[in-house]
Amino acid sequence: MNKTIRTRYAPSPTGYLHIGGARTALFCYLFAKHSNGDFIFRLEDTDVERNVEGGEASQLNNLAWLGIVPDESPLKPNPKYGKYRQSEKLAIYQAYIDELIKQGLAYKAYDSSEELAKQHEEQEKAGVASFRYDPTWLKLSESEIKRRDEAKEYSIRLKLPKNKNYSWDDLVRGPISVNSDDIGDFVIMKSDGYPTYNFAVVVDDHQMDITHVLRGEEHITNTPKQLAIYEAFGWDNPVFGHLTIITNMEGKKLSKRDKSLKQFIEDYKNEGYCPEAIFNFLALLGWTSGDKTEIMSHDELIKKFDYNRLSKSPSKFDIVKMEWFSKQYMKKLPNEVIIEKINSPKDAQWNNLFVETYKQQAATISEIKENLKIYLFPKEKLELQIDNDLVVKTFFAHLKAKDFTIENIQAAIDETKNALNVKGKDLFMPIRITATYEEHGPELAKAIYLFGKDLVYKRLTKWS
């Protein structure tokens, strides 16, 4: 019987959900759901000083907003798999550490941070390109070892075999192999008693029966270390896949310090982007469907997801493309959903026409709210210039002769066009500016109608 596919997203509660983390979570979610498997949310919260209050809830809430709902989490645990927060598993990690020490597969390393720095320095001077820990470097007396041991002034390192290749067939990149001599014995428990990332994540993945690990390429260097830990315990390792980085449009890796680009899901949520659009957009950051389709629903993406189509090249975060996605979804959003979000005091008929008109070009709810202000707080003074007042006079003359409806406003525009033989910008701009006091906007007849007859006539009378 085939094992159930189980993937996981395991962030640290150190801040808001970043675009990169959201993309990783999404691919893990799609991978699991495509195979009728389970997607697990787990928390790596042992770095107490960096943890942010509310960080866990923020991560889960933003994932839920996107439509990424885990099958298991700290809030929805499966008792079979134990705790879902690393901070609640310290005794378990310690027991596994003790087991490795007992078997001679790990040992106490008594180096102080200053002594390690000196070893680093000596290797650099000797031309060693990348630091390898040398367990024979530190020379201590028996009494000093005893003192440091009693004071718990030590870390625990995994003892690696010499000249051993750790290899895996990466889901994204194909075969990768790293030799143990290029790694060196590495720390699996820090001197503060907390396990390192590489150790805790192996224990967690093993205990939770994780079958596939999809994560960013920055973890490639961690994988051979994790394989060494799996081997030390005699456990089967999951299948690994390392996603390419996300860059800005200049090809530079996204930096959280770059304020020119919104990089946190919370920002898009607050501005009123369609979550389905962000879900769709993120799925195409490093993956393409076999039929090249771009607009795909949640269920379509699950059905079509194929890890073989994950990109081997970096993905550019194109904000213009994301805006386009959001506009496509905004057009399809039911008017009543938008009306509920914009808190308009106008009547139902007006609200429906307003939303139907303005959602055609809007990427966010915030944009629609801004446009609503044009009608709720209309400008009292025209601050724009027009080139041809004859167009305005002619338009108003035709408009006054009819009932004030969208169809008749459009008819007055068309009659002005025919009477004066003007078209395009020369026709529309004078009318738009004088009737709406705006230079840009949606379909002109509807934009004018939404202001109401009294205000439009008051504005145009000045030109008659």
From Swiss-Prot:
It is an enzyme of class 6 (ligase). GO terms for biological process: glutamyl-tRNA aminoacylation. A motif ('HIGH' region) lies at residues 11-21. Transmembrane segments: none annotated. Catalyzes the attachment of glutamate to tRNA(Glu) in a two-step reaction: glutamate is first activated by ATP to form Glu-AMP and then transferred to the acceptor end of tRNA(Glu). Monomer. This is Glutamate--tRNA ligase. The gene is gltX.
